[in-house]
């Protein structure tokens, strides 16, 4: 099996901006090839695109899967990835709704706490997901947004679910990230 399913790794996606105007065509090729490989194995969905905005403080485990450091780049490249998967017969699952980019900790091992204001989140991270409110399936994030719900991770928070449904306007199927991750009690 060739990458991305093998142990060999493709170059980190957080370097996509270095491709300049070629980034979109590279993403189309990359995600079209990924779709072809998945279909050849009988797999018809992929937990991609990753729509988190990378920041200098984003945990490296997530950062190398992000498509950019601003919402415009993430939306543009995320849409190319989404469309390439879908047009090649794969159901894309957007993630990590409503945004994981502010997290400086890996949710596989602990619950990341985001201290950004609700206003900043709505204008940036949540705005990326609003641009994809037409998606059929999304995966939630195990991240605690202190300004919105200081007690529950987004994946278990009624307040965050209300934001996802009412502010982001996502009406599709919402699935949880892995519930065995240490971020959840």
Q: At which residue positions do the language-model features occur?
A:
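Enzymes and membrane/adaptor proteins characterized by extended Gly/Ser/Thr/Asp/Glu-rich
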Residues: 1-73, 102-114, 141-153, 176-185
